[in-house]
Amino acid sequence: MLVFRNRETVNGLETIMNACAWRMVATIAFWTWNISHLVGAENTIFHPASKLELLHTRAAQLNSGLTESPAVAPDGRIYFTDMPFGKDNGMILCFDPKTRQVSDFTKDSGKSNGLTFLADGSMVSCDGADGGGRRLIRWDLKTGKGVTLADRFEGHRLNSPNDLCVDLKGRIYFTDPRYGGAEPRELEREAVYRLERDGKVIEITYEVEKPNGIVLSPDQRTLYVGDHNNGGNRLRPTDPEPKRGAMKVYAFPLDAAGRANGSRRTLVDFGRENGCDGMTVDDRGNIYLACRSLARPGLLVIDPTGRELAFVETGPRNQSGLFDDWKGIPSNVEFGIGDDAQSLYVTVDKGLHRIRAKTRGFHPHLAAK
């Protein structure tokens, strides 16, 4: 069952801490998630009796890595990526909520990380560096074939597209940091971009050090971006070793044209800990953050002002009551649709999990129809 704690019992943890990690999920089918709900006696986000259900764990003996970016297709199936390190190009997998079966969509994803869907039912992936495609790919679900949508900004190769979201007009916002890979960098900045319907890539903001997770508010007026600067990757081999930097979540106001307009707001500052990875929103406008923390791994739910509504622990505790290092770290999160609309899908370590929520997600590729 879920354990609820009031504000007094979690004081001192309101400045959320985080970190990133991976592990092979144990063979148990359920974990207990501890939830701290900080706005009242009744939790409005999760059911007290909900359990975290393990749906899939990697079977192949691949080189480390993690699962990432669950994304819901128009038919309700959940696609997600499996990103091994090293020479393996990674996979895109598909979970069917009706049959509970997981199948391979492609065994050569080009180091795909983030996924999303467009209104026509096609899927778009962010292909990263370290031997990957460093581009956005549009996938045909029927044929399994992909075509490049974008791999350059102003003639220069992208760094390593990481995560993305689509707006109601079908335009794709994406983050382009560089965390690893020996490929030479051609762009000075690690920025947030938007792919227009005509194929042009425009820069939305570079007021982030290492942009990672990204999502739009349901009213399309705010762009949320996670800044996860772990020190990263040198621009040039002769540059000094990069230092760790910002671990924050920002809210960028957007104008009617969907461009950053006005000063950003800091919603969460993770301090010296690592920041969040992927994120999603519900139809109320609340933001769900996958916090990659050794100190407090889990899902942080905040409202648009940054106020904490709930926190879900995804990391297992040891006999001392502490979190085990580099275990149970979430990477991304997504809601289902239809009969599955209150299911929250979470990639943790090398697995896919699900938990029941009281809320429903907001999906632009469906709302745009």
Each language-model region and where it sits:
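Sequence-structural signature of mature extracellular/luminal beta-sheet repeat domains
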Residues: L38-K369
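Sequence-pattern detector for short linear motifs
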Residues: E8-V10, A26, L141, A357
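Short, intrinsically disordered low-complexity segments
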Residues: F4-N6, W22, S36, G76, ...
